[in-house]
Every structure is written in structure tokens, then in C-alpha cells.
Amino acid sequence: TCLEIGEFCGKPMMVGSLCCSPGWCFFICVG
């Protein structure tokens, strides 16, 4: 789950917005 910009993510987050990809988040997303 991505909560803030710059947080590392291991897998894509498509909840709310396309904010996370296999790497780093660029947008704040909720989910």
C-alpha cells in the first residue's frame, strides 16, 4: 500500500490512481 510520495513499492498499486509501479511511488494513493 502506498501512503506517500517516494515510498518504495514492491508491486503495482492500482487502487484509486496509477500511483505505484514496481519501484517507487509518484503519487499519493489510497488503498
Swiss-Prot record:
Subcellular location field: Secreted
Recorded superkingdom: Eukaryota
GO molecular function: ion channel inhibitor activity; toxin activity
Alphabetically ordered keywords of this record: Disulfide bond, Knottin, Secreted, Toxin
Principal cellular location given in the protein's record: secreted
Gene Ontology terms: cellular component: extracellular region
Keyword Transmembrane helix: no
Cleaved signal peptide residues: none
UniProt note on tissues of expression: Expressed by the venom duct.
Disulfide bonds: 2-20, 9-25, 19-29
Domain notes: The cysteine framework is VI/VII (C-C-CC-C-C). The presence of a 'disulfide through disulfide knot' structurally defines this protein as a knottin.
Family listed: Belongs to the conotoxin O1 superfamily.
Name by which UniProt lists this protein: Conotoxin pc6b
Native species: Conus pictus
